Amino acid sequence: MLAKRIIPCLDVDNGRVVKGVQFVDIKDAGDPVEVARRYNEQGADEITFLDITATHHGRETTYDMVERIAETVFVPLTVGGGVRKIEDIRNLLNAGADKVAINSAAVFTPEFVAEAAAKFGSQCIVVAIDAKQVEDVEGQPRWEIFTHGGRKPTGLDAVAWAVKMAELGAGELLVTSMDGDGTKKGYDLALMKAITSAVNVPVIASGGVGNLQHLADGVLEGGADAVLAASIFHFGEYSIAEAKQFMAKQGIEMRL
């Protein structure tokens, strides 16, 4: 069995790491290079860097910052935000990213995912899915994909979309519950389970971690291959090492 991964996430806005609640109400959490260095030293399995306003403002991800982070850390680095063209992916990989996350562009042009996977290999293409719980016509809960940092509904069903993205060549899915984001109430385990049981590519759970049990639940109940968190690490509540030891005690295979 592959070890499960802990991935601290750097949401970057105007050159600073920030953290919001449900994609708004933003707090400053430091300099991206310093924050990344700290997580590298703490034993993070990977680091994710998301330029959270790049798509909204139509701005390219800051390549120089990606270069500086890549020089600082020695674990896989996933970078996303404003990725719209093959050239964007090439530039990010050249800057030192190991994987590139595609979000809004996948919704507008699904074939872009297939093209990217064909050109660079599925192993470095991550599709980021931001989902919010809505009710269908019968009043049953389902999850809908939102784009532009959670601002725009798409009408797309999140589980069906996840299946489609995996079929098109995404090597990994980063699934964020927008209802949970920053709330510290835990992952949306029903959403995670629905997606992890429907696809055969690794799924990263994101959105809502408030304690170490939430991380473990993402794996044990949500079926996630990796767990992503921000606030609990950024503001010093827990270290990566504490998180790994806690999860290992629950029988989850971790790289300690």
UniProtKB/Swiss-Prot annotation:
GO molecular function: imidazoleglycerol-phosphate synthase activity; lyase activity
HAMAP family referenced in this protein's UniProt entry, alphabetically: HisF
Cellular component GO terms held in the UniProt record: cytoplasm
Domain of life: Bacteria
Swiss-Prot/TrEMBL GO biological process terms: L-histidine biosynthetic process
Pfam families: His_biosynth
Major enzyme class: lyase
Entry EC no(s): 4.3.2.10
Function: IGPS catalyzes the conversion of PRFAR and glutamine to IGP, AICAR and glutamate. The HisF subunit catalyzes the cyclization activity that produces IGP and AICAR from PRFAR using the ammonia provided by the HisH subunit.
Keyword Amino-acid biosynthesis: yes
Protein name per its UniProtKB record: Imidazole glycerol phosphate synthase subunit HisF
Pathway note: Amino-acid biosynthesis; L-histidine biosynthesis; L-histidine from 5-phospho-alpha-D-ribose 1-diphosphate: step 5/9
Residues annotated as the enzyme's active site: 11, 130
Assembly with partners or alone: Heterodimer of HisH and HisF.
Signal peptide: none
Family: Belongs to the HisA/HisF family.
Keyword terms: Amino-acid biosynthesis, Cytoplasm, Histidine biosynthesis, Lyase
Gene3D superfamilies (UniProt xref): Aldolase class I (3.20.20.70)
